[in-house]
A protein has these predicted regions:
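Metal-ion/cofactor- or nucleotide/acyl-coenzyme-handling active-site neighborhoods
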Residues: 1-214
């Protein structure tokens, strides 16, 4: 079978050897969010502006990165566009400014911050991913979606604790950048939709075998 592993960041991920997955050339791996800190999956999926900023800021290029919000434009427009934000927002830049000939802009209203991210038009590992289900779906759902869109017919999900242990949203990276410290008390804002999205993704890709491993 054409097998893909979707690597989530729930605590149960510790039960699985990522190194074993990496050595199996018959498997394609799709990681979620900041998995890159630990393991270079074949593909890295992200849909949160702050996480995308972290990935690009660190000039991470070991995985093919799929961002649901990624619309780079030529730097010919950079000065006029960024200037329009400076009066009301703090502007923070990320990525390789010297090498990049394209840029993307992300606003983060809670802190009145605009992130300007630099990338290349040729040879970049970053690309836009358009989900089939919902823009509001979790990163894990987007990663499953991406694997299905690429034709994988057998999908195994690890570190998906909110599915295998309902109501458990603990995260391996809690307490680090972009992750809350009080993980045991945290419920994601869209958590009530996640179960629905998992059902929708299975229905949409009816011929794909999707399995969640504890």
């Amino acid at each position: 079978m054409n097998t893909a592993y979707i690597i989530g960041n729930g605590l149960s991920r510790k039960n699985h050897s990522l190194g074993t997955l990496a050595r199996d050339k018959a498997i394609t791996t799709f990681g979620c969010n900041v998995l890159y800190r630990t393991f270079p999956a074949d593909y890295l999926v992200a849909n949160d502006a702050l996480v995308i900023y972290e990935i690009v800021r660190n000039d991470y290029t070991e995985s093919k990165c799929l961002f649901t919000d990624w619309n780079p434009i030529s730097r010919d427009h950079e000065e006029s566009l960024v200037e329009s934000f400076k009066n009301q927002y703090t502007v923070i830049r990320g990525g390789n400014e010297n090498r990049g000939d394209m840029f993307s802009v992300y606003g983060w209203e809670p802190t009145n911050t605009v992130y300007v991210l630099y990338s290349q038009s040729v040879g970049t590992p970053y690309s836009k991913f358009t989900p089939v289900i919902s823009e509001e779906a979790s990163t894990g759902i987007h990663a499953i979606d991406a694997a299905c869109q690429q034709g994988h017919t057998e999908i195994k999900c690890i570190g998906f604790d909110s599915v295998t242990d309902k109501g458990n949203y603990r995260n391996i990276y809690e307490g680090t950048e972009n992750y809350r410290r009080d993980g045991e008390k945290y419920t994601p804002e869209k958590a009530d939709l996640w179960e629905k999205h998992h059902s929708l993704i299975k229905k949409h890709y009816g011929k794909v075998d999707i399995e969640y491993l504890s």
